[in-house]
Amino acid sequence: MAKVIQLSDELSNKIAAGEVVERPASVVKELVENAIDADSTVIEIDIEEAGLASIRVLDNGEGMENEDCKRAFRRHATSKIKDENDLFRVRTLGFRGEALPSIASVSHLEITTSTGEGAGTKLVLQGGNIISESRSSSRKGTEIVVSNLFFNTPARLKYMKTVHTELGNITDVVNRIALAHPEVSIRLRHHGKNLLQTNGNGDVRHVLAAIYGTAVAKKMLPLHVSSLDFEVKGYIALPEITRASRNYMSSVVNGRYIKNFPLVKAVHEGYHTLLPIGRHPITFIEITMDPILVDVNVHPSKLEVRLSKETELHDLIRDGIKDVFKQQQLIPSAQVPKKSAPAIKNEQQFITFDEKPPEKKVPEKSTAPSYSPMKLSSVVKEPVDAEEKLPPLQFDAPPIVDQEQTLEVSDVSAEQPETFEQECHEEQPQPASDRVPIMYPIGQMHGTYILAQNENGLYIIDQHAAQERIKYEYFREKVGEVEPEVQEMIVPLTFHYSTNEALIIEQHKQELESVGVFLESFGSNSYIVRCHPAWFPKGEEAELIEEIIQQVLDSKNIDIKKLREEAAIMMSCKGSIKANRHLRNDEIKALLDDLRSTSDPFTCPHGRPIIIHHSTYEMEKMFKRVM
């Protein structure tokens, strides 16, 4: 039998590095979080070959004294917790004392640090061992350069992705940290080219604009709700701004960005029926709570956390998002064709947010688009050479905002620059009926789209989607009735299933009855339906009952709330006006009046838009009546 031995510190650090340092992005995350814990206000990150060749992080934080600097590269050495009680009230981003020794054990590392009092310290390490020590300048702060990452762990290096993928991971990490800490000016460069720069003024809206662009930032709404245990703040994109993945949904708890599926689920439920299937919103959710309610000591990466009172937090976020959208008019405006301009790629863009814009004469202003929660004034200047546009890092003042990304040149001449604060003050809750303007029908297109107008322009309404929304809200109430009014069928319906399917149906008969499907056994693996709720769509009963049963058969876990929801959606779709159905004027007027009375009149239950708006100004611009 093999003997039990004590592993060396060098081997222990390599084992720990397997969890802490998964890829270059992990190194960047740990070093930047250390800089933030050191009260830095400016952080500069320089990357070569997506971090595999070199990672440099420079900050103006507190720095370290000579002995502390050497001690920091020993396992479980930290200045952030001192006893067991501190572990349950962690307020810093780091606390385990594993990051620096783990990074040093799989790389060549140089650190230069000073507290600003006397000479600083410079250490050079290879594979976790200090090979040289010297004095350095007394500039306050810390500079760490990590090179030849994974030089002594070729297996890990073998599984690195392409430069593009690894750089994307680094950018994602830095973006989320920048959102969590808008008070810190962060600059990220790859081979000398800026990928991100924030101004550190504490306004997360400027960070959102730097990451996603001003066009998206204009269409993000503020969120702020609280309870006795939680305060939730952030920004959520209007439903028209969606992405194909969840990567654009950021969650922060007590300044630490995390990955938590229940929080993602809460956000999606807040957007319920406003998003198309398979699409996800852009959101930034910042949660503040007592540290004792969150356990961050779950995994060395500290991305996963355990939250106490998770259900309460889930409901707070979901209901808060729903309340935000109840106050908005969510009719998207059609885009006016613009002169084609090439996208500007891989060049530095300077975006200025004017807090007090100068007075200027504005051309005739367009009718305000329906989606205008906040206004950003932006000036896109001509790109300049990298050497000119990237001044050396200054610690006495945060650098200006400049963002390298693909930007489309937008026509902003028709917008009067205003501050975020002015725009936010303009937001007022609107009664449900006032969110949809009064429109006067003028006809139909292909028996599918209703055309209506008012003083603000032309509205195009999808008649099927409109009635689908109306019927969905009706059926959603009906399907939850405890004792629905039933109607006997003249000719009962029979259904036949396999043995396995029949076992599932028997197990979930009660759930099926709760949505109006009343099954009686009718021989081996067969069922008969003799009645159904009176409000079932006429002529669609058999197909609807079969689809609801199939929904139960296809689901691994039956959620009665979700089953009722799906049933209401199916009923509304089957019972609504189909395409190529020509309506009379009075039918159109009744449909629009009913739509105005719904709680969410802007999207169908599947998340597709119901109304599109062409403003009078947009129409005139398309016909060149205005330039």
Curated annotation (Swiss-Prot):
Keywords: DNA damage, DNA repair. HAMAP family: DNA_mis_repair. Pfam families: DNA_mis_repair, HATPase_c_3, MutL_C. Belongs to the DNA mismatch repair MutL/HexB family. This is DNA mismatch repair protein MutL. PANTHER family: DNA MISMATCH REPAIR PROTEIN MLH, PMS, MUTL, DNA MISMATCH REPAIR PROTEIN MLH1. Disruption phenotype: Double mutS-mutL deletion strain have 40-60 times greater spontaneous mutation rate. Cells lacking this gene have an 80-fold increased spontaneous mutation frequency. A double mutS/mutL and a triple mutS/mutL/nth disruption have a 200 to 280-fold increased spontaneous mutation frequency. The keyword DNA damage applies. Residues 354-364 have a biased composition (Basic and acidic residues). The keyword Oxidoreductase does not apply. It comes from the Bacteria. This protein is involved in the repair of mismatches in DNA. It is required for dam-dependent methyl-directed DNA mismatch repair. May act as a 'molecular matchmaker', a protein that promotes the formation of a stable complex between two or more DNA-binding proteins in an ATP-dependent manner without itself being part of a final effector complex. Overexpression of mutSL partially suppresses the high spontaneous mutation frequency of a ytkD/mutM/mutY triple disruption which lacks the system required to prevent damage by oxidized guanine (8-oxo-dGTP). One of its GO terms (biological process) is mismatch repair. One of its GO terms (cellular component) is mismatch repair complex. GO terms for molecular function: ATP binding; ATP hydrolysis activity; ATP-dependent DNA damage sensor activity; mismatched DNA binding. Residues 354-374 are annotated as: Disordered. Induction: Constitutively transcribed during vegetative growth, with a slight increase during stationary phase. Probably part of the mutS-mutL operon. It comes from Bacillus subtilis (strain 168).
